Every structure is written in structure tokens, then in C-alpha cells.
Regions:
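Bacterial Sec-dependent N-terminal signal peptides
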Residues: 14-42, 47, 95, 108
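Short, ordered, surface-exposed loop/turn motifs in non-cytosolic proteins
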Residues: 39, 47-62, 155-159
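Glycine-centered loop-to-beta-strand initiation motif
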Residues: 41, 69-77, 114, 179-181
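Short Pro-Gly-centered beta-turn/loop motif in secreted/extracellular proteins
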Residues: 76-84, 92-93
Length: 323
């Protein structure tokens, strides 16, 4: 009986001591003995007014931790071993960023707001070749680039086109009329040491540099074809005299790929002026009549062949006179 009473007293005393002891959670950063910590913050757009960015991947590689920001752009990483490291931020459509975390004896750190810069967006890209047939059996080759690019921050400093395989890197010029970044580059002639044909199938990348010096590779395209076959005119030619509505005829073009014609008439003078253009002429056609009367004077006309990728070739010039 005495032994039983002694056991009861011991249990009661032990319970009393346990109730008076402080309850310290080893995972609680407030616990002075804890070696775990937390940090938190927000991710927003650099563009004003700053807006929260949801779904940003926030990674802490020290502990192989990865979370995403919520609808408010908020993140909170808890129960982390306290060791200095780098926190990374990654979101499609935005430039990557990072921040160095130094605990400095802190166990809970407010990292404030990280601002992500939107990556310039390539909406459309056309890269095509142009071959102009000239007399003396010569051909002039031109590489053309047209890029539609938008940037939320409007901080683009330069845009260039690059082909590493060809050691080619040229800057594009913004055309306010077309709202495009463009390049019209004389590549050489048919007999160039490095002909335009070498560019077929190579990747041409669009590179954007912003005002902070950040570089973005925003997309690429390839050259599909260089049209070397020559389209030949039939009449009028060689300065023949015609009326004000001449019938323009050419020899049927059979290149083995889909295409359309474009016809242009220019004044024949030191500074030629375009007086008439007809586009989207069906590939089976071999003649066209201008839908406007030409004034008395000297002219020449050319035939363009344009494939489905905008690659094109121009005939030699055919001259005529209107009387």
C-alpha cells in the first residue's frame, strides 16, 4: 500500500514540474535555441503602377526549396536552416532575378519587394531574301528582316539580328511608319565569296538590349530559299513605243514551288519614280494591263516572283516609251 502511494505522489509531482516548464517549439524561429529561420517578401512588375506577379517561382537552393508567389505576389519560406545563400526568382515573360540573403543573426527577414522587368516580346518575325537580276548576267542579293516587337517598359536600346554560324551580326532600325524593326542588307552578288545561299537553314536570332544593358534573345527564324531562277519578260521591251495602256507580257515561270507575281512600272530617269504596282497576281497568269493610263514618257517595268515565305526575285528591267 505504501509503495502504491509513493508512486501516486511521484506522478503528481512530475506533472506539476511539467506544467511549469516553458513550451518551446524547436521549429519556432522565436525559440532562442532554434537554428531555423524564415524570410518573406513580394514580387511585382517594374512597370508603373507596380502590379503583383502571381506564379513566380521562388527557389532557395540551400535547402532545395521551391514555392510560387500567390495572387498578391507574396511568398514566405519557413523552417530554413540558417545559412547565407541566394534566392532566385523566375517567371515566363520576365527577366530572371536574384537576391543575396545574409541572415546576420536574424531568424526572420523581410526581403521587401523584388521588381521584375518584362522581357521584350517578339510578335512577328519575317526574314527573307531578295535577288535582283541585272544585265551582264549579274544578281544583287539582299537580306531583309522585319520584326514586330513590343516592350512593356518601353526601354529598348537596340535590336539586332545575329547568325552565329555565319558570324553575322547587324543592327535593325526602327521604322515609325511600319512600327517594325527592319534591316535591308546588301549581302553581295551571285559570285560573292560567301553567297547568300550559305544562309539557307541557319538560325537568325533577334537580340534586344535594354537601357540597363540586359541582353534578351527573344526568338529566331530561318531562311527557307534563295530564288536563283530568272523570270523573263516578253513585251514591251527594248524601248518600244506603246500606247497609254500597254499589255505587259512575260514568259511563264515554272520554279517548282508556290508563288505569286508582282509587277511594277517606273519612270526611266536618273531618279526613277514608281507609277504603278500590281500585287498578288496569280502564278498561272502571263500578262496584265495596268488599270491606269500612263502619261507620255519613258518607262521600264519589272516582274517580281514572291514565294510563300516572302523570298523574292526580280526580273531584269524592260524599257518602253508611251506616246
Amino acid at each position: 500500500m505504501n509503495i502504491f502511494r509513493s508512486i501516486i505522489v511521484f506522478i503528481v509531482l512530475l506533472s506539476a514540474v511539467s506544467c511549469d516548464a516553458p513550451k518551446l517549439n524547436p521549429l519556432d524561429p522565436a525559440n532562442p535555441d532554434s537554428r531555423l529561420g524564415q524570410f518573406y517578401g513580394y514580387v511585382k512588375t517594374a512597370l508603373l503602377p507596380q502590379q503583383p506577379i502571381v506564379g513566380v517561382k521562388v527557389s532557395w537552393k540551400n535547402d532545395n526549396r521551391l514555392i510560387e508567389t500567390d495572387a498578391a505576389g507574396y511568398y514566405n519560406l519557413e523552417n530554413l536552416p540558417i545559412a547565407d545563400g541566394t534566392l532566385y526568382f523566375d517567371k515566363d515573360g520576365y527577366s530572371k532575378d536574384s537576391i543575396r540573403v545574409n541572415w546576420q543573426n536574424n531568424k526572420s527577414i523581410d526581403l521587401g519587394t523584388i521588381l521584375l522587368n518584362a522581357i521584350p516580346k517578339l510578335n512577328n518575325l519575317i526574314i527573307y531574301t531578295c535577288v535582283e537580276n541585272r544585265y551582264q548576267d549579274d544578281q544583287k542579293d539582299t537580306l531583309n528582316v522585319k520584326a514586330n516587337i513590343t516592350d512593356a517598359e518601353n526601354d529598348i536600346e537596340s535590336v539586332s539580328v545575329r547568325c552565329t554560324a555565319l558570324s553575322f551580326n547587324k543592327q535593325l532600325t526602327f521604322n515609325p511608319k511600319s512600327n517594325l524593326y527592319e534591316l535591308n542588307y546588301f549581302y553581295g552578288t551571285k559570285n560573292s565569296v560567301s553567297p547568300l545561299d550559305d544562309a539557307i537553314g541557319k538560325n537568325f536570332e533577334i537580340i534586344v538590349k535594354d537601357h540597363l544593358g540586359r541582353i534578351f534573345n527573344i526568338g529566331f527564324s530561318t531562311i527557307k530559299r534563295v530564288i536563283r531562277q530568272e523570270i523573263s519578260f516578253e513585251s514591251p521591251a527594248n524601248g518600244v513605243t506603246v500606247g497609254s495602256n500597254p499589255v505587259l507580257r512575260w514568259i511563264r515561270f515554272l520554279p517548282g514551288f508556290n508563288f505569286q507575281y508582282m509587277i511594277q512600272i517606273y519612270t526611266r530617269e536618273a531618279n526613277p519614280q514608281s507609277v504603278w504596282t500590281s500585287q498578288y497576281i496569280f502564278k498561272d497568269d502571263i500578262e496584265v494591263i495596268p488599270d491606269k493610263k500612263l502619261s507620255v514618257g519613258d518607262y521600264y517595268w519589272v516582274i517580281w516572283v514572291i514565294d510563300d515565305f516572302q523570298n523574292r526575285a526580280q526580273s531584269k528591267q524592260a524599257s518602253f516609251t508611251v506616246q
